[in-house]
A protein has these predicted regions:
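Conserved ABC ATPase signature
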Residues: 134-138, 142
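Catalytic Walker B motif of ABC-type/P-loop ATPase nucleotide-binding domains
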Residues: 159-162
Length: 270
């Protein structure tokens, strides 16, 4: 579990996030959502140590990340997997070499052990046979899967995903969501996802933190979010493309209650 308490960060005396407290549960997909400029990206960067907060406390289970020195933070980061928005693959390296990179940086295993690990994670993300391909030779969805494989190759305890569905079509996004969900459960890791994709929220959002103008505005789960009475959250939901398909059965199935269609229609139509 990751716990944050009263996290604050500003730039040039302008506050960007103010007094944010939340818990991100182990074995769950914890989503941070909000409009552009809401502070969700800065919050995630604080969580992984790319930015130092001005105030507040970050706890990784029983370890206080906020009080760690530089060397201790380096050790902690080895327990963290990162899936970047643009996949951040090395164009000059093959798929295999991209995934091997963290192992070469941080692992003392033999070359054979490293290769076995690379083969295993490639198999897990259904990319057998792609070892020798270069990023330019594979699709956007495959690049995301390479990014996921690289993010878990060191057996992290914590996984951070920054806009994992950015640039993907809806069907591929669904595949990536499902893969992140499966890996979170199988590895029993704490997964934190920064997204504005409401389909992802409904598909895999175990816990949801909604940010508004640098503050925590709402916290709950995907079964509660559609029926929330929070006006700012509802405005964010109604502004998303998600509501174009909000009456489909997928949404009702996610809520777990087919008989709530009447409530859904009332919410959408007034």
């Amino acid at each position: 579990m990751i716990s944050i308490n009263n996290i604050a960060k500003g730039f040039s005396d302008k506050p960007v996030i103010e007094g944010v407290s939340a818990e991100f549960e182990t074995g769950k997909c914890n989503l941070i959502i909000g409009a552009s400029g809401s502070g969700k990206t800065v919050l995630m960067k604080c969580l992984v140590g790319l930015i130092t907060p001005d105030a507040g406390e970050i706890m990784y289970d029983s370890e206080n990340f906020s009080l760690m020195n530089t060397e201790a933070k380096k050790i902690m980061r080895r327990k963290i997997g990162m899936l970047f928005q643009g996949s951040a693959l090395f164009d000059s390296k093959t798929v295999e070499q991209n995934i091997m990179f963290p192992l070469d940086m941080f692992s003392h295993d033999t070359r054979a052990e490293k290769q076995k690990r690379v083969d295993m994670v490639l198999d897990r993300v259904n990319l057998n046979g792609a070892h020798k391909k270069f990023p330019a030779e594979i699709s956007g969805g495959m690049k995301k899967r390479v990014g996921i494989a690289r993010s878990i190759v060191l057996n992290p305890q914590y996984l951070f995903c920054d806009e994992p569905n950015s640039g993907l079509d809806p069907q591929t996004s669904l595949v990536i969501d499902k893969l992140i969900r499966e890996i979170t459960t199988e590895y029993n890791i704490t997964t934190v996802i920064n997204t504005h994709d409401m389909n992802s929220v409904m598909e895999i959002g175990d816990r949801i933190l909604y940010m508004y103008q640098g503050k925590k505005e709402w916290e709950g789960n995907s079964k509660e979010i559609i029926f929330s009475k929070n006006e700012k959250l509802n405005s964010f939901i109604f502004a998303s493309d998600f509501l174009k398909d909000a009456k489909d059965m997928r949404m009702l199935e996610v809520s777990g209650k087919i008989d709530e269609k009447r409530n859904m229609d009332q919410l959408l139509n007034g």
